[in-house]
Amino acid sequence: MVNSDYNVLKDWMFGKLNFLLEDLDPNPNYSILKMSLGEPTLKMPDFVRHELSINFNEWGKYPPSAAIPELSNSILKYIERRNPGAEKIININKNIVPVPGTREPLHLVGLLAKNTKVGETSAIVTNPFYHAWRAGSISSGSKIHWLNALPENQYLPNILNIPEKILDTCVIMYICSPSNPHGGIASLNYLKNAILLARKYGFILAIDECYNDIYRLNKPKPVGGLDAALSLGDNLDNLIVFNSLSKRSNASGMRAGFIVGDEKIIDSYKLLVSNGASPVPIPIQKAAASLYDDEEHNTKACIHYDQNFQIVEEYLKPFYEDFKIPDGGFFLWLKVDDDEEAAKILWKKFSLRVMPGRYMAKEVDG
């Protein structure tokens, strides 16, 4: 009665962590500190409260599947600042759609890839992985081909050594920059090569850029899929980019962001939303517009994370010769002898909740 393909979703990182720690008590002398998921604890700007308040009556209206004009314009201006020149290849009515955060669309885009090739199909997924990428791959009806993100490749998957038979059958590929959880940043050439592969072999390239606005301020801003598409020409063919306010604006609970890309993908996604997925309520769209208009709060967040990493480096560098502050994101990916045992010790001794790396990854090639 229930599709057994989804049984694998029971094997997910947060459920595993709960099971690992459920019989262990944290140290009562310390406040519990959750460092096991990407939930910012910084405050949202006060103007968000104002936007939600003055638009209270809009809660009575069904939200459209497309962006309201205020949000479309704010997103386009944000793209002009973030990916200069990319606005020239974007039609705000055809290439952009608001989303309730990116977890849902990362999953649903897999449905759009289903039945786009004949026979057994493949989905290429970065490993370690965010669980929505796996869910989307399953929904595409494909067998997952895991690509390891290793330190020798700046914690990005090596996309140039994918077997031809996998590329021929691929319907969707998920990559992430800055990478989750390592914080590795893809170069422009890397992203261009990914787009060229998608176009040559006819699959959807889904680029998760949810951490794209969290980076070290002494480094250049990360480039993105739109920069790569612009450098290749004047279109967004085969590409879809995911952007969220959860990390950029400390707005995880607001569930707001956008996807931008190939008109055919966006058009199908709008139809999917209209028939059975979640549009973004108008008050949230208006609050999201105000957040995309403002850069100051995001800069403050980057400063905060920079300071945190400097403190961590001071304490951990003596114990880790190869300690490196990640170029992007706000996670710290540390090599330990036994990740599960380390998680239990940190919980029992310091009330610190961390995620064992093995829970975010699949064992591939030993």
Predicted features and spans:
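N-terminal small-domain helix-loop-helix segment of the aminotransferase-like
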Residues: 3-101, 291-292
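Helix C-cap/helix->beta junction micro-motif
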Residues: 140, 200-201, 319, 350
